[in-house]
């Protein structure tokens, strides 16, 4: 609202209905991803809505980046500064080796592209697997983690590889293997979580070819997860 008033932005009808939950589930009602060049916040706030928020999945990276803008506006800290004492340090992630790219000239973390180690990604996934707890401390709210690891919206229509059409939680994809969810970065940076089997898999790769990440998932299913499912 402050941005809208300051710059007299012409916002589309229905924008006020968008909630953080809609951003987390990629259901903000926009049919396409707003331009992240220039003033991405203004671009987001002036993008028309095609669907009623909460009813239709459409992957929207700019929406996720808006979470960083919200944190900066409300706390005066970027995402990395905000999360360091509340999450990173508590689960053993060294913030010095975690890089969160920023939008140029804004101080806002969230521009697509974070750099983290395989082990640090594993730590975050293990925290989720434990219901948001780490060494007996509730680091992430249990309810948030529980809902994140549930299908909140169908993605059956998504023009993605097969494992992109199995549903979506809170910034987490459901996998074609029932009960399995994943953090999914570019070119196959994965953390797979299987709560029922108390299993986490973290991997880095450079799957740049067509359907490369899907091939990686298929190999994991065929060589590991299918056998575990029978145990």
Model-assigned labels for residue ranges:
Residues 1-25, 46, 75-111:
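Active-site helix/loop module of the DD-peptidase/beta-lactamase fold
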Residues 9-14, 51-59, 107-115, 183-187:
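Solvent-exposed loop and edge beta-strand segments that line ligand/cofactor-binding
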Residues 23, 58-87, 121-131, 198-201:
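Alpha-helical scaffold elements that line and support the substrate/ligand-binding pocket
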Residues 183-231:
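Structured C-terminal helix/loop/strand segments within mature extracytoplasmic catalytic/sensor domains
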Residues 94-98, 146-202:
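Active-site Gly/Thr loop motif
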Residues 84, 88-148:
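Active-site-proximal binding-pocket segments
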């Amino acid at each position: 609202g402050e941005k809208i008033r300051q710059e007299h932005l012409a916002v589309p009808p229905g924008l006020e209905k968008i909630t953080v939950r809609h951003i987390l589930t990629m259901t903000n009602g926009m049919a396409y991803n707003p331009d992240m060049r220039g003033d991405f916040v203004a671009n987001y706030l002036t993008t028309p809505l095609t669907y009623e928020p909460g009813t239709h999945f459409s992957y929207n990276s700019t929406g996720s980046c808006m979470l960083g803008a919200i944190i900066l506006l409300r706390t005066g800290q970027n995402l990395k500064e905000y999360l360091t004492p509340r999450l990173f340090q508590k689960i053993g992630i060294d913030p010095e080796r975690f890089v969160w790219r920023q939008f140029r000239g804004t101080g806002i973390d969230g521009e697509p592209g974070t750099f983290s180690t395989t082990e640090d990604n594993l730590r975050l996934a293990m925290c989720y697997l434990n219901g948001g707890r780490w060494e007996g401390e509730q680091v992430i709210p249990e309810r948030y983690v529980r809902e994140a690891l549930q299908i909140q919206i169908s993605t059956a229509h998504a023009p993605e590889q097969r494992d992109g059409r199995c549903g979506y939680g809170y910034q987490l994809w459901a996998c074609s293997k029932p009960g399995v969810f994943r953090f999914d970065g570019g070119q196959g940076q994965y953390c797979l979580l299987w709560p029922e089997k108390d299993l986490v898999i973290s991997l880095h790769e450079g799957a740049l070819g067509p359907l490369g990440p899907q091939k990686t998932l298929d190999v994991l299913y065929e060589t590991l997860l299918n056998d575990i499912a029978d145990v």
